[in-house]
Amino acid sequence: MGYRVVVAGATGNVGREMLNILAEREFPADEVAALASRRSLGTEVSYGDKTLVTKDLDTFDFSGWDIALFAVGSEATQKYAPKAAAAGCVVIDNSSLYRYDPDVPLVVPEVNADAVLGYSKKNIIANPNCSTAQMVVALKPLHDRVPIKRVVVSTYQSVSGAGKQGMDELWDQTKAIYNPTDDKRPEKFTKQIAFNVIPHIDKFMDDGSTKEEWKMVAETKKIVDTRIKVTATCVRVPVFVGHSESINIEFEDFLDEDEARDILREAPGVMVIDKREDGGYVTPVEAAGDYATFISRIRQDSTIDNGINLWCCLLYTSPSPRDATLSRMPSSA
């Protein structure tokens, strides 16, 4: 017997991708309902070879439904997720609302799949921030071999992380560079994104870090190990899809780069492409269309006794099928 599945936010990029992946993976769903806000009521969305007509999230009765995939913002999640959970539907939430709630598991399947068993406290499972998700997939297998002491990460995050408006702004500004009659001032981003990089994602905190950077610290501790020290610098780059990260890892004891490479080759959700030659690494272009976290440039850090440097890339399309959808297929729930 299959599940009855709800996708809330079905007309957005993430919601549509959820429906695509549910169909592609042949998830055992007997029935799928597509929900949207009142202004999108009646919109048609694709689910495999079927067409679903969206229903009103505000009036939907979650009773008798098994799983609700929430691809709406924190405000809507706060209003509707408790309603769904109280009706007995397991909510799997993409927003940041429940990530730091001690009674809600924060799950990356390749890293802490067992944590999903804690969903019953509130009937809610949270999904981490995109930049955290790809990093912990790389960190966890290494941490299991030799405990990690400290992580320094710099991100190169595509405009898809800012949604369709961010992608449109990059496209429009790029065209405007070559057509001076077009005046495309920044709207979604605080500064020009075309042919530029912006060291600012989300709002600024009192200590000078941004909320995106704070998320990476807090979520890594919750998912992997509270004892790991993490410092992050998150940067928006003029790439349409695909997030990348430069990660420096300091271990408690020595870990050889060859052993680290072997560990990562065997790790779930990881694809190692690491040749010390021109083109022997992965960029966001190559990562597009695949659900793996690609890792390259694995090498010792000669400035500390127990350090490793690496580069990782992950497809991300607001968010990627892997982050936003695959981690929402709760086989244990």
Residue map of PLM features:
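N-terminal Rossmann-like NAD(P) cofactor-binding subdomain of oxidoreductases
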Residues: 1-193, 229, 262, 276-304, ...
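Hydrophobic alpha-helical segments, chiefly the membrane-spanning helices
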Residues: 327-333
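A glycine-rich, Thr/Ser-enriched phosphate-binding loop motif common to dinucleotide/cofactor-binding enzymes
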Residues: 123-134, 208-217, 322
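Helix N-cap motif at beta-to-alpha junctions
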Residues: 251-254
